[in-house]
Regions:
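Alpha-helical transmembrane segments of multi-pass inner-membrane proteins
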Residues: 2-28, 42-56, 73-85, 103-235, ...
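Flexible juxtamembrane loops connecting transmembrane helices in multi-pass membrane enzymes
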Residues: 158-159, 221-222, 242, 255-293, ...
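TM-adjacent membrane-interface loops and short helices in multi-pass inner/ER membrane proteins
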Residues: 165, 282-326, 333, 340-347
Length: 582
């Protein structure tokens, strides 16, 4: 690829990430929209990945890989497709049904992102990382400005900035320190001064943010540097590459397992063991392991954790945190096991092993300066650590997949080979671009349709407007508002909307409750059993579930259901008082 073309690729990718990091839906345009950050990130990612795919198709001679890398990508795609088809919620699993939109389509887009970044040599990649740091520092500055009420962004208050959440903010800034070090190692004195100021800015922003994970990231960064400086005193056996790769991969698994056990160890883990946020996560993780144990091979479906959470949450979780409903496991390891099962997890693990192997080969062959390589490895480690304890935004995932793609590309990308363009080589990336653009278009259309209607409803709660819901929008975040709009057209339209939602997402609890309540209010006992039993299956501990199910059990004489409900109520500490619904 010519120098000019590579420069254009660097500039485009850099600007694309800046857009992904800072773009959002301003409150002035759609003030009543629920989430003004994640939808924009998804659309931006899909469009950028589609353009990457077109570039890959046009420059296919640059994207030739060893078979092991091809097998890894193919395994990931295949496992995602199988989990997608087996989920029972095709569109929800494709786009994502947690409100953060991390379904299969985002995985495909991130894989394309990784492939695109595999083409870069060291010097262009340094320039690219500069763009990425500019974007992250823009987010940091925006967060600080918001903290002092100079500007205001949608989402949480304080320093959440364009990410909408202080945890997301802290995670992104905390993982940035190794990238700043990477640039400092490859910059002039003036550049190092600027980068030092950027690091200080991030520390100050983390101080304002408050989440403990940001300080832990900084601590891991300092410990990592100390290990590198003291490496000559650390025994390093001359083991074979395969053994070191296996040990590195196993170490990642053990580290993820240790983090999983942390909330259960309590006082054995100083500071963190009894942290409130850590304790809450233990309940999320137990729900995830129960989902996994019931769907071992392919999981409950990509990004379907939230739709299965109420069925699998523990009694302790229900009693302690009755009003907390989690749409995410808050752990990449638990979320992956629960949603894509053993097969999908092994596919991701294979790619992690490939990244580790690439780092080792580059280290041995000195393809890249070892200090710079260590900084990138430290970034990967700190990112993975964050992902094991917290949700990660799509813009944050973008950087991780970009770095991993670059590393793997240094080892497993074959030299370019001039040849005639064959449609067979262009077909797959062009098909990828078409799918990504199609999903982006349909998702954007669904968002705009929802936002425009919800604004009219917010202005006048009695307005009667025809609204056509889209399966692209999650039940968890959107259905309640959709139901309010539909109710203005009458109960029949609201019931029709609920049935449409359940046809696409059989685990939409709000829709199931509405249909069950409607049947109860109408005294439709014959058809009530199926509705009640389904509701009891997907949300057994909800007050609405217990009340409606008890009504049916008493009216129909269903002794078995009544006994199950009484046991459930006793466990939850509830007292049954006969009334209108029982």
């Amino acid at each position: 690829m010519s120098l000019r073309t590579q420069q254009k690729a660097v500039v485009f990718s850099g600007l694309a990430f800046i857009a992904m990091a800072v773009l959002h839906i301003p409150d002035q345009i759609f003030p009543h929209g629920f989430d003004k950050n994640a939808p924009v990130q998804l659309v931006t990612l899909l469009i950028v990945a589609a353009l990457y795919s077109i570039f890959i198709a046009l420059k296919s001679e640059r994207f030739r890989f060893h078979k092991i890398a091809i097998y890894g990508a193919a395994a990931l795609i295949a496992s995602q497709l199988i989990s997608l088809l087996a989920s029972g919620n095709l569109i929800g699993s494709l786009v994502g049904d947690s409100g953060r939109f991390v379904g299969s389509i985002s995985v495909f887009a991130l894989l394309v992102t990784s492939i695109f970044h595999s083409q870069f040599r060291f010097e262009p990649f340094i320039t690219l990382v500069r763009f990425y740091i500019v974007a992250i520092e823009s987010v940091a500055l925006a967060g600080i400005a918001q903290h002092f009420n100079l500007i205001e962004f949608p989402g949480a208050e304080g320093v959440s900035a364009t990410l909408g959440n202080t945890d997301f903010f802290a995670a992104m800034l905390g993982t940035t320190f190794p990238l700043i070090l990477f640039l400092a190692l490859n910059s002039s004195l003036r550049g190092r001064v600027i980068l030092g100021a950027s690091g200080a800015l991030n520390i100050y922003a983390l101080y304002l943010a408050g989440p403990l994970q940001g300080y832990l990231d900084l601590a891991f960064f300092v410990v990592g540097i100390a290990i590198y400086l003291l490496r000559r005193f650390i025994p390093r056996p001359q083991w074979a590459l395969n053994l070191r790769t296996a040990l590195g991969t196993f170490a990642v698994i053990i580290w993820a397992e240790f983090i999983f056990l942390m909330p259960f160890l309590g006082d054995f883990i100083p500071v963190l063991g009894n942290d409130v946020q850590v304790k809450i996560r233990s309940n999320f993780w137990l729900a995830g392991t129960r989902q996994f144990s019931d769907h071992l091979l392919f999981g409950v479906g990509p990004d379907q954790y939230g739709n299965n959470y109420e069925q699998y949450r523990t009694i302790e979780d229900i009693v302690k945190y009755t009003n907390i409903l989690s749409n995410d496991a808050h752990s990449a390891s638990v979320q992956t096991l629960a949603t894509v099962g053993i097969v999908g997890t092994l596919a991701f693990l294979f790619l992690i092993a490939l990244v580790i192997r690439s780092f080792l080969i580059i280290w041995d062959r000195r393809i890249i300066d070892r200090k710079s390589l260590f900084a990138l490895a430290l970034f990967v480690f700190i990112y993975l650590t964050n992902s094991f304890v917290s949700p990660i935004t799509l813009s944050h995932k973008f950087i991780f997949w970009a770095v991993c793609g670059f590393i793997v590309g240094q080892v497993y990308r074959l030299p370019s080979r001039r040849s005639e363009r064959k449609f067979s080589k262009m077909a797959l990336p062009l098909l990828s671009a078409l799918i990504l653009l199609l999903v982006a278009t349909l998702f954007t259309q669904a968002q705009l349709n929802y936002l425009s209607h919800i604004e009219r409803y917010a202005d006048d709660n009695s307005v009667v407007q025809e609204y056509k819901a889209s399966p692209m929008l999650p039940c968890f975040m959107y259905f309640d508002a959709e139901l309010l709009m539909a109710s203005n057209l009458g109960p029949e339209r609201a019931a029709e909307l609920s049935r449409e939602e359940l046809a696409n997402n059989p685990r939409c609890v709000a829709a199931q409750i509405y249909l069950t309540k409607t049947a109860v209010n109408r005294g439709e006992l014959p058809g009530l059993k199926e509705l009640v039993y389904r509701l009891y299956e997907i949300a057994p501990a909800r007050n609405d579930t217990i009340s409606l199910a008890m009504y049916y059990a008493n009216r129909s004489g269903d002794v078995k259901l009544r006994e199950a409900l009484e046991r459930q109520m006793k466990t939850l500490g509830l007292v049954y008082i006969p009334g209108q619904l029982g």
